[in-house]
Amino acid sequence: MTANHQSPGMHSILLLLLLPALTTTFSCNHLRHQDANFSWKSLQLLQNTAPPPPQPCPQQDVTFPFPETLLKSKDKKQAAITTLRILQHLFNMLSSPHTPKHWIDRTRHSLLNQIQHYIHHLEQCFVNQGTRSQRRGPRNAHLSINKYFRSIHNFLQHNNYSACTWDHVRLQARDCFRHVDTLIQWMKSRAPLTASSKRLNTQ
């Protein structure tokens, strides 16, 4: 990761605190050339970061329903806010000091760097003007994403951050990158972009 004096956990907290301070004045009229492949590259890094646990895992009878209505936004600005929130939570989760020992730290840091850079790009899409009341997306959307990731955090904590628990959470992270791709593709359809997106078929 880029060298700095802040721990990944502290930086992730700062990122999560930053979002409410953003205005909802959306200024990104065009997605960048590399945006089309962001989710695909992230899935590749996630797969390389998290190999299967050393021991077989029992079947996990637990689900984390994602608020699918957030993927059907008709507003480009709101789609960007949702994407930003998902990525901030993913950064926070994957920078945990409790990730399994068999995960590949160097690749995980590459993944965190990629997420961090894209978060920074999305933050630049918001212009700092307007009152505090204009600086938040819909409260229900904010709460539903928080609830989703809080349930994942509670699951990890309840199971003492075991390797098998993290493997189940890895699948949730994989789904989140696919949700991010859905949002990016929707935003791409509202703006010219020459890069063609690769299919997200990583298992």
UniProtKB/Swiss-Prot annotation:
SUPFAM superfamilies: 4-helical cytokines (SSF47266). One of its GO terms (molecular function) is type I interferon receptor binding. Gene3D superfamilies: 1.20.1250.10. It comes from the Eukaryota. GO terms for biological process: adaptive immune response; antiviral innate immune response; B cell activation involved in immune response; humoral immune response; natural killer cell activation involved in immune response; nitric oxide production involved in inflammatory response; positive regulation of toll-like receptor 3 signaling pathway; response to exogenous dsRNA. Glycans are attached at residues 37, 160. One of its GO terms (cellular component) is extracellular space. Pfam families: Interferon. Has antiviral activities. Belongs to the alpha/beta interferon family. This is Interferon type B. The lineage of its organism: Eukaryota, Metazoa, Chordata, Craniata, Vertebrata. The gene is IFNB.
